[in-house]
Amino acid sequence: MARFAASLALAVVCSGALSGCNYFRQKAQDRYVYVTARQVFLRDRVAAVSNRTGTATNGEKLVVLDRTRRAIKVRTPRGEVGWVEEKLTADQKTADQFVALADTHQKDPVIAVATARDEVYLHAAPGRETARFYRLAEGDTLRLLERATVPKVAPAPAPVAKPAAKPDAPAVGADKDAAEKLPEDKEPASATPVTSGPAAVVPPPVMEDWWLARNGKGQAGWILGRMIDVTVPDTLARYAEGQRIVGAYVLHTVDDPESGMLDNGKTVEQIPEYVTFLAPYKSGLPYDFDQVRVFIWNLKKHRYETAFREHNILGYLPATIGTMKDPYLPGALAQMSLPSFSYRVLAASAPIPAPDPVTGLVQPTTLITKTYRLEGNICRRMLQPGTPVPEEAHPVPETPKEKAAKGRKKRK
């Protein structure tokens, strides 16, 4: 009897201990997914016929309640519960990649402002097969931060059906029945031996430009270059001469009450003057721009004119816009703070850079910073007197005539 009482007491103690463990046990941590589609509808069951129980929009955080092979049962922040397709969501790891991308490039200088041509996704890295998350609407404004170029993913070639092989016709006088009884696993010998021709030349891969961009919500990601349009004033677009303007920056403004330019029926009196950077309409280039042009406003003729132009260079963004005094020359003009701009070009001693095979970034080794000051209708380079002009690289080799003309310009 005493042994039975002791066993009963031990059982009660163990039961109490287990109850205590359950009391102090922490609640299982929630799992989350994020909506990648523009909008999804929650359903009450996974079936061909179902009822809507709620909606969720792009980027919204959902709590995972249950899971099947292709669907997830979730709860929205508003308490709506239902099933969604798993392919329309991203996991926490993908969301963390985009958060880290935005934090890393939060203070990067803005190269240009662009708009989305259509509904398009932001990717975690350059490339069509990389993870995607945020979905942009047509016309969304973006700030471009960095360019990368990667090979385009080619679609898988369609299988080509081989035509049925026809047996060779029997020679004159040969046994017709013998030719017809040729075994199926034996092919007639070719009359001429097959000779291997010269090795086929493999064409270079087709490249695509991707831009790291940030939208108005602070969300960052990579977007395909051909899906955006750089914001350029209409008054400058006609001066592009078949080139693509990759950056247009306001140097300063001039007053012209008789400009003739209208905005909503009103005359624009404050006319901006620009420095622009242009490049060919081609992806995969080892530079961001190969031409620089400064447009100033002619107050007498009320139109834009070119005050400075440089071409055949390997230039890299971003550019720097500001004001400065001339530190090398005396006089009242030199002491005035006038508009200035700086940009970087590849040095002649540096190799032409190739895109990084992993990141797609183009990282030149040696760059030359060129600074100019706008003095009226003249752009003057800020270079200390007696300093030799550094030699620059060129996409197209200069002709002797161009070198001689540049030499005369330097001596002046």
Model region roles, listed by residue range:
Residues 67-70, 147-151:
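Short, charged beta-turn/beta-strand-edge "cap" motif at the junction between a beta-strand
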Residues 46-51, 121-131:
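Short alpha-helix capping/helix-loop boundary micro-motifs
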Residues 271-285, 329-349, 399:
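Short beta-strand elements that form the blades of beta-propeller/WD-repeat-like
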Residues 33-73:
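Post-signal-peptide N-terminal segment of Sec-exported extracytoplasmic proteins
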Residues 16-20:
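C-terminal motif of bacterial Sec signal peptides marking the signal peptidase cleavage site
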